[in-house]
């Protein structure tokens, strides 16, 4: 950011980042001299009281609607096609050294997407259990299917039994609580909610592209040494991503 200010002589901009760069130092730096920020907030890392309010299904407004009536998202039938693209939000005051607001959104389309991804991972976890091999959890990968597997060594009475593996239903239930929910913190006071969400949404779309490139198209690691071949590899991945996005758009992201 300091280089942007120096090299491009820009002093007024909105800093947008994921939760990994949500330090107090970054927020303070972007709270002066016409700078502002929109930063992803991990719902899992909120204080317990704030988390309960954020994940509560009541108190929502609809983005783009003039209605001030608060909505309980459980009262909406999201199997109805007309409701799938609706987006809801609520604001929660936070105790913070910087004057900011927490904006929590709920998207039924995003909830369905997350549930679909998790169901595939649960299926992979079930297959891992059935192989009867030794299971190694990749602690560095939060999307490792093995996170849904628990080792059972005692029965319900606490008696030691021959160990076996089973799906961790508590873990599955815990993760499903966050389906569809997303949150950002911002020091923008007068900016429209819809505009703030739009800015943050573009960052999420870029991140998803990188994820698809890496996981689906195996962009990395690169097992090549010749520069021309390396460039050809990334060009192939990039063209594949464009085709993927065009097909997804054609199929309405189904």
Please report, for each region that a protein language model flagged, where it lies by residue.
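Anion-binding and metal-coordination hotspots
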Residues: 1-254
